Amino acid sequence: MRTYGVFGPPQEFPGMQKLFDALNHRFDADLGPPAETIDETATLKSMAARRSHRRFKPEQLSIELLQMLCATALSAPSKSDLQARDIVIVRDKAKHARLAEMVGQEWIPSAPELLVFCGNNKRQRQIHEWRQKPFENDHLDAFFNPAVDAGIAMQAFVTAAESIGLGCCPISGIRNNCDVASEVLELPEHVFPVVGLGVGWPVASGHVSVRLPLEATVHVDTFKDDAIAEQVEAYDNRRYAIHHAANQRQVERFGEVAKYTWSEDKARQYASPERADFGAFVKSKGFLLK
């Protein structure tokens, strides 16, 4: 039986069985209930079994529902309570269409709702002007904190939305051409797009993406990756047996392989530059990144 340093062996605990079934399937693990008493597991079950959705019913959500979900998302942690993140709800059809065209993923035009989570360092600088205090943190952290804050808010939105039955799919491709996204959304200096999100009532459930084993990604006290090559190989084999990509990347450059695994896909993906101009865009927004 497999064990993990911080996790004990599985135990009999029928009320949490679905949660641990989902976790153990995703991570190929033998996790069991903790010693602590946990009465409510609905959110945990939803998160453990989550999957991205790219097919939706056509109807839009009410603005009231979107505002409720945004408020819930913005209740998530924020570095030093700086609240350096904003959400743009894209309801204008022309803007939606232009962003979808820029990203280039065929499912996005049919997503009923498109949101863009932005990092915002402008507001902090404005506060310094209003309070007549010098802004002495014009370095990498001025960009990094809003970027992380926006990512946290996006994940909180996903958790909230999926808890009521909505489906979501994050869109990193919103950064494929940040100049276009910034123009469409009229983002000022020191405000930048971090991630998009397609949202709607799902019509089909996507597959659950199994993850790397916890031995590879959860560490106790010290980071260790002595066995990472073997762990990735085992993960490749398991993932390929469950679900693997239908299309191979860059066949003209790397050819076709009989067994197209996760690591092969990721190696091919990052064998070509992606968003190499993102740093220049961020600097054009007024960030020094020093």
Identify the meaning behind each predicted range.
Residues 2-290:
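Acidic, surface-exposed loops and disordered segments
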